[in-house]
Amino acid sequence: MPDARALGAAQLWIGTSWKMNKGLAESRGYARELAEYVAAKPPAGVQPFIIPSFTALTTVRDALGDDSPVLLGVQNAHWEDHGAWTGEVSVAQAKDAGAQIVEIGHSERREHFGETVETTRLKVAAALHHGLVPLLCIGESAENKQAGESSRFILEQAAGALEGLTDEHLARVLIAYEPIWAIGENGRPATVEELRQPFDDLAREYGCRTMGLLYGGSVNTDNAEDLLGIDHVTGLFIGRAAWQLPGYVRILEMAAAHPKAKA
């Protein structure tokens, strides 16, 4: 697998997190078929990545193979390298198991597991220290949106997590904008018009300084092409639409055919 420190050539990032889904057999089968697909049809200008469960991490790593262009991530990691943190997995341990990306700050972790601005900052710093790519998830609630506070809220989330980083560090960070009201089984797909302002705001602050600005939230094969067409969007972070390989492959193909992949 490629070294995360050497990334950045891809024009579009297309990834999926499996959340708490898929056992070892299903994970292995998905990864093997994906490895075969990208070997036969490399998606030019596109960086694929998948984020399985911790228990399937090494299984997926082995199924993808050493030379796979597909990057592998974890859904969370602790900032300390080791210690009395029962139930946690450190960034260092995740890297040792094959991870190249660390998903940080997903809204479900903020809501259910007490993730804060401070812990996201610590995790981003730890990921960078160990040469992994932090995938920082930010997004506002429906209440924030209705109050007209979307841009302020997401910019504050990003600023808190990225505080103190140099431009060299920021160049190794991915930001995924995932409005809470648009994600999950009951999420409402955001319209292109609803997404223009948030991405304009993020691009003004971080667009040329980070590795990429991704969108996640009810992404599927019907809307992926339109979402990629939004100014400043340089990738998609997909949920259930990519949990079956044909859906993920279809979106990879859309991305590879998109003008942004050829820029």
From Swiss-Prot:
InterPro entries: Aldolase_TIM, TIM_sf, Triosephosphate_isomerase, Triosephosphate_isomerase_AS. It catalyses: L-erythrulose 1-phosphate = D-erythrulose 4-phosphate. CDD domains: TIM. Gene3D superfamilies: Aldolase class I. Belongs to the triosephosphate isomerase family. The gene is lerI. This is L-erythrulose-1-phosphate isomerase. GO terms for molecular function: racemase and epimerase activity, acting on carbohydrates and derivatives; triose-phosphate isomerase activity. It comes from Mycolicibacterium smegmatis (strain ATCC 700084 / mc(2)155) (Mycobacterium smegmatis). Keywords: Carbohydrate metabolism, Isomerase. Disulfide bonds: none annotated. Pathway: Carbohydrate metabolism; L-threitol degradation. PANTHER family: TRIOSEPHOSPHATE ISOMERASE (PTHR21139:SF42). Disruption phenotype: Cells lacking this gene are totally unable to grow on L-threitol.
